[in-house]
Amino acid sequence: MRIYSCHFCSSPVYPGHGIMFVRNDAKEFRFCRSKCHKAFKQRRNPRKLKWTKAFRKAAGKELAVDSTLTFAQRRNVPVRYNRELVETTLKAMTRIEEIRQKRERAFYKNRMKGNTEKDFLRDKKLVESNPELLKMREVELQRQAERAAAGVDEDAEMGDSDEEMEDASEEESEEEEQQQQKIVLKNKKRSAKKIAF
């Protein structure tokens, strides 16, 4: 049983699967699925499509240059059957596969090494710009403390009469915000009911 590789995306083509196109110079092109066959007919470049092995190797996302990959090359030279040779090749195949998997894992770890710092910095920047993403109650308390501190500064300048007016206006604004939130929630519920079948 021979498992071919797709001419377009390099994924395995198992017996009884896929499509084979034979050109008039007798060159065979095997495809794993109609997606690859259509892309080939449209003369698309596999190196420009992110889901192909060719792109991943060209972009440095997968191990491309390695001695273990040379064993997978197809050889059309007939060899006389030898029982010992078959045994050694079968043992070598399993060993080569283990080595290749180890090297691929090491390559992936090496490629992902600097990502933790980048992710941390990106998340930190996001939290600094949007503190609401953290616990809502803590953010609200901080804002109230800031308002109170700002109110104390203004009181020193304007006096006690202004303080009462500010408190009243703050209470009114908070009530308005709560009413707006209730209205928005009600609207969402109504729209959800309309959409449901």
From Swiss-Prot:
It is found in: Cytoplasm; Nucleus. Keywords: Cytoplasm, Nucleus, Ribosome biogenesis. Its main location: cytoplasm. The keyword Nucleus applies. Pfam families: Ribosomal_L24e. GO terms for cellular component: cytoplasm; nucleolus; preribosome, large subunit precursor. Belongs to the eukaryotic ribosomal protein eL24 family. Associated with nucleolar and cytoplasmic pre-60S particles. At the end of biogenesis it dissociates from cytoplasmic pre-60S particles and is likely to be exchanged for its ribosomal homolog, RPL24. This is Ribosome biogenesis protein RLP24.
